């Protein structure tokens, strides 16, 4: 008897568009590419103390309603222009939520917030929203949680984050080493710095690992390393101020 030993706990499977399909469906224009390229470089200059402005990522905990996000972006873009000489503002546009146990995992995973998990719809909504925000002249930052989803949106992301719950993950450190944008790594949920410091050192280096391409092929990827990795102090058992 040949026993079933493969995918025995997978109960459903639905195909989603390959990254290149959504990228081609919702391409970025020259102005958006200029915005993303320029703000990535500006963030890098600030991180390396070659620009004395303050870099601030501001916005909601996570995106659940694209229309509300656009209204927020419209207001933030006004402030961005007002304070641009002293502050580089990036809008926090988080589509994925890491959970300590279970709960809603974000717009990409469950865009209708009703446990229907229409990931194809979520990916499309995420890309469309990022383009609309960029058209306002506002750079966007996001947390990278799933190792495949970056292929759908990273060309519109000026800054990225690795969360406290994934800072020690080898997969996410490898991912950070290959991202085209500056990447912040949070300190651990206990407030300790070691996970973030180790994560930065790992992200600085080249890595070789399995990953997905824009064509949705599985490939060996080799990264150059990310010298714009830095710590995000999230606090722990007490606030950072204390």
Regions found by a protein language model. Give the residues of each.
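Conserved, mostly hydrophobic/aromatic
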Residues: 59
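N- or domain-start disorder-to-order transition segments that initiate the globular core
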Residues: 6-50
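Short charge-dense sequence patches
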Residues: 16-32, 75-80, 194-205, 233, ...
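Generic N-terminal targeting/processing segments that precede catalytic cores or assembly contacts
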Residues: 35-53, 68-82
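Active-site-facing alpha/beta catalytic cores
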Residues: 2-7, 86-242
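Glycine-rich anion/phosphate-binding loops
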Residues: 63-83, 116-128
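Short strand->helix junction
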Residues: 62-63, 238
């Amino acid at each position: 008897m040949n026993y079933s030993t493969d995918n025995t706990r997978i109960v459903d499977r639905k195909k989603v568009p390959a990254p290149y399909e959504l990228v081609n469906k919702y391409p970025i224009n020259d102005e958006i590419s200029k915005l993303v390229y320029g703000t990535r470089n500006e963030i890098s200059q600030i991180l390396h103390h070659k620009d004395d402005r303050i870099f601030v990522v501001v916005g909601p905990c996570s995106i659940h309603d694209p229309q509300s996000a656009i209204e927020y972006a419209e207001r933030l873009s006004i402030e961005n222009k007002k304070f641009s000489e002293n502050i580089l503002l990036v809008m926090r546009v988080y589509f994925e939520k890491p959970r300590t146990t279970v709960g809603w995992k974000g717009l990409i995973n469950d865009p209708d917030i009703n446990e229907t998990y229409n990931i194809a719809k979520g990916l499309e909504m995420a890309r469309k929203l990022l383009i609309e925000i960029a058209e306002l002249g506002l750079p966007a930052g996001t947390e990278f949680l799933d190792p495949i989803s970056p292929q759908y949106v990273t060309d519109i992301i000026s800054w990225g984050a690795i969360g406290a719950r994934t800072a020690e993950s080898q997969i996410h450190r490898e991912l950070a080493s290959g991202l085209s944008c500056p990447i912040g790594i949070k300190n651990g949920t206990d407030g300790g710095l070691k996970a973030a410091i180790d994560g930065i050192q790992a992200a600085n280096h080249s890595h070789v690992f399995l990953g997905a391409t824009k064509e949705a092929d599985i490939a060996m990827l080799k990264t150059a390393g990310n010298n714009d990795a830095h710590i995000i102090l999230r606090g722990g058992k007490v606030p950072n101020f204390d």
